[in-house]
Amino acid sequence: MRTRIDHIRIPIAAVAAIAVALVAVALGCGSSGDNTATAQPTTSARTTNPAPVHGPYSPTIDPANFVSGVDNRYLPYKPGTTLVYKGVAENGTTPQADVEFVTHKTKRILGVDATVVLDKVSSRGAPIERTYDWYAQDRQGNVWYFGEDASEFKHGHYVKASDSWEAGVDGAPPGIVMEAHPKQGDAYRQEYYPGHALDKGKVLGTAGPIKVPFRIFGTTLSTVETSGLEPGAAEKKYYAAGVGNVLERVVKGNHERFALVSVSP
């Protein structure tokens, strides 16, 4: 899952708990701004937070409350779509590419048919990580993350399975990766598998303009992600309506950065 702060592309060996200066990295024709405003995304309705970050966490998953496919405004996953991102690894210099492909496959987890998204990270053509992520959307419009099957590679060769988990296995519940109606200040659990994954997300508000190689976005939704396993790390992400994630960069911990280059078809 590209939203993992405790599993950012190349696993972080050690994270300094201090803020690092944001770096402007040449990405073909793109760069970006970082003007997070206080304005909030327009909402037509509000629902109770299904993945609260405080207190016991044991969400009730009713398969009847889930729909087929994922068409959330800020995180749509239409089968057949390919999103290509380019950027740099945690050292701020090593080039990396990330290709997300929304497959036509589903995986049944806890009775819910989750959309399978294949995420492949590489550097100079050599594979680094391959992950199958599982997403599903409830009838309220929230996008849930049901886990991942991740593999790591070194020098182009398979090394090991990495931080894989599945909702319902070993007590791990699913989490939220995008709310139906995100509001500034909202916080939610993305992953809750103690000892393996403890990611949280928080809505910062609207941001813009954001310029990436794919295009310029006048308005985006800005979030920040942190992890209980990496207390000194934080990553900002920017989402565009109808497209999804367009820019992400680590703002505490290292210099990793990725920006959207293309979307097809």
What are the residue ranges of the model-derived segments?
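Bacterial N-terminal signal peptides that target proteins for export
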Residues: 3-16
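Core hydrophobic alpha-helical transmembrane segments of single-pass membrane proteins
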Residues: 15-23
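Bacterial lipoprotein signal-peptidase II cleavage site
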Residues: 29-39
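Conserved functional acidic sites
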Residues: 44-265
